[in-house]
Amino acid sequence: MKPRILIVDDEARMQRLFEINLGPKYEVMTAGDGEQALEVVKSREVALLITDLKMPGMNGMTLLQEAQRIYPDLPVIIMTAYGTVEGAVQAMKEGAVDYILKPIKMEEMEILIEKTLSVRRLQDENRSLRQELQSLYGPTRIVGNHPAIQRVIQLISQVAGTKATVLVQGESGTGKEIVARAIHYQS
């Protein structure tokens, strides 16, 4: 399945340019304004949002804020013909992954898109692996209703959130390694 990229620009010519150049590698969706784009973000999974900064109605900066409120992990690239250093800094502070000036060189845009999607894939994979480790080594893997076991689970949760060094002691076969892994993977 091709990654879905949403292009938001009030110029149909720019929308078409992206469709022609990116269509072979990506599923390209277009929107003419910020309101249409938000509807797409709410209803469809989008891998990347590329938006113009200056548009009638909702501008690109507001779209960035609203889209990330709905979907915080959505990478957003802002493009503009009216670039300023202050605008770029503000966009990056708001969460844009990049801020590029028009006219756009499509080769550079394709490299930026691939880099952005690679970072997103790595973040998704990292999140998935962390969840898997949590399910394998989290405190829920330690079973028992005895107050002593419940106290161990509580202690694991307490120390895992700190930078403290922990020494786990006990006789052979008492579950020291399980406790150590639970602390490690919750840290």
Regions found by a protein language model. Name each.
Residues 12-30:
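Two-component/phosphorelay signaling modules centered on CheY-like receiver
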Residues 52, 80:
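Active-site residues of response regulator receiver
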Residues 130-187:
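AAA+ ATPase active-site-proximal loops
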